Amino acid sequence: MAPKPNPARPDTDPVHGQTVEDHPAHPHPAASSSSGPSARQRLASLASHLLPGGNTEFDYVIVGGGTAGAVLANRLTEDRNVSVAVIEGGPSDVGNDMVLDLKRWLEMLGSDLDYDYPTVPQPRGNSFIRHSRARVLGGCSSHNTLISFRPFNEDLDDWANNYACPSWPASTVQPYGDRLKMNIVPVAPQQRNQVARDWVLASSKATGAPVLEDLNAHIVHRGGFQKAVGFFDIAYDPYSGQRSSASVAYLHPIMPHGPHKRHNLHLFLETWANTLVYDSNDSSKVTGVKVTTKHGLSKTLSARREVILCAGAIDTPRLLLHSGIGPRSDLEALGLACRHNVPGVGLNLTDHPESIVMWETRDTPPETVMSSDAGLFLRVLPSHAEPNPHPGPDLMFHIYQVPFADNTERVGYERPKHAICMTPNICRSQARGKVSLASADPKDKPLLDFKYFEDKDNYDERILIEGVKWARKIAEQSPFKQHLVKEIAPGPAIQSDKDIGEYARKVAHTVYHPAGTCRMGTPSGIHGGEGKDESVVVDQKDLRVVGLKGVRVCDASVLPTLPTINPMLTILMVAERAAELIRDDAWVDGLRKSNYH
């Protein structure tokens, strides 16, 4: 999805992508008088070639060609008798070195491939946080650092036991991790520079955390860990440094110029989904999506079976709200008709907030895979500090070998030329916010209110206070301390818990993991659900939007809570399971349904 069509970019990559026919319903009068084909006619001819007959009806319409959407597009088109359309707001990533070269991920922040959503003012946090959201095929897996961790068993069992998701325990979900197509490996030894190696040893020495060579394998075989330090598992090719994103792994092989192209896959690139379309005879049934190309021309893409929303934790609730699905009072306040009152749409917004501790260094360390190749995991508060006690770590550190100084400079700190940053990260933030609409205009960016550090008991702030203290202890260890010149931020003058907490909140940032805004659960009155939980948007049994037919959600928005560590693999695993649920629903007693709805 895209917040606004970009007139500088084409609707399609004619080699690697496909698009809707881009011509008006009523041709311009000059078109018939020209001696040769007009530009619009040539474009229409190209579109007709790519989509025979100007096809706008498919079995499945997927909104969002990102992390989850790529998985679903691949798995559903394995049935050659099924046609699948993917609506993607950005361009193809094929041949784009800025996207495919993992080392260049920082170049994409704030670029034309970034939706760059601001946050609303945060009374207790940093009001200047920009949430980077990818505008490119592959979504955030084409935009992030590809740090790849399976969820801890306890993360998934928490959904089952405490969030009315009995269909999603670890025993059910973990096997889907074995199906992932991405190449996930620890950072290659030859790409581990001495600074990162020394930091890993210093972290272990200061905290007692064991050094694990393959953190992900430890999760797979033991279900998780409480503390550990080591180099990350990353989805990449260690020889070329190229991404193994969801797009590269799931879409590139089956696209028109891929080695296993599938003619039943139709990519609509640089195409914006405006609203859902309802059956004229059944207001509870979704039958398609209204879309707009960058030229402002509109089409309706119809789904014979289902529409599947994979636009992410920001744009999936945004599309639902613009389609009249959400809290009645919020919609009517903007002049939007409420077609289905689903109060939970946009609620439960959560994230992995982080702060920063920065030291000046003498020079920039040798380049690594993506400047943040190792991590530390600790338990710093007692388990009863959380509403649902969790045995895993509650604090995570990244080490960045570049100066992340925007937020510190804003509050008066110097910007060093060379720096190392440790970023304490809250594994299970207790703050919950909201995504809402700024106006009834689909082109306007939504309002993101994460309510950073507004959780009761100041749990999130307490985690960061402990994180700053541990960072300083690590910096005292040899040989790592030989790389450091001086502490820049928060600086030696900041010592009390009160001062550390205030600093940590003011310069806090995000690791870009918004989730939970269309959370799954058990709707009241069905599947044995008790009571009424209005925060549930998606039925955990099948990922269908509560009270509607023909529309499902599969992306980070359905997660009741974030997993302890980076959520990308969790989202991929949810998508693998969703594909299986969707395919199974299309068959009865070994026969394909003739009337899907």
Stretches found by the model and what they are:
Residues 2-59, 584-597:
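Extreme N-terminal leader/targeting segments of oxidoreductases
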Residues 36-175, 337-345, 351-361, 371-375, ...:
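N-terminal glycine-rich phosphate/pyrophosphate-binding loop and immediately adjacent elements
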Residues 79-85, 90-95, 100, 169, ...:
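Glycine-rich loop(s) and the adjacent beta-strand/alpha-helix scaffold that form part
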Residues 145, 160-279, 285-286, 356-360, ...:
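Conserved redox-cofactor binding core of oxidoreductases
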Residues 260-264, 317, 321, 325-428, ...:
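Mid-to-C-terminal "cap/lid" subdomains and adjacent gly/pro-rich loops that border
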Residues 268-269, 274-277, 479-562, 569, ...:
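A glycine-rich dinucleotide-binding beta-alpha-beta segment and adjacent secondary-structure elements
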Residues 404-462, 524-527, 531-565:
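Active-site beta-strand/loop architecture of penicillin-binding DD-peptidases
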Residues 561-580:
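A conserved FAD-binding loop/helix module that cradles the flavin
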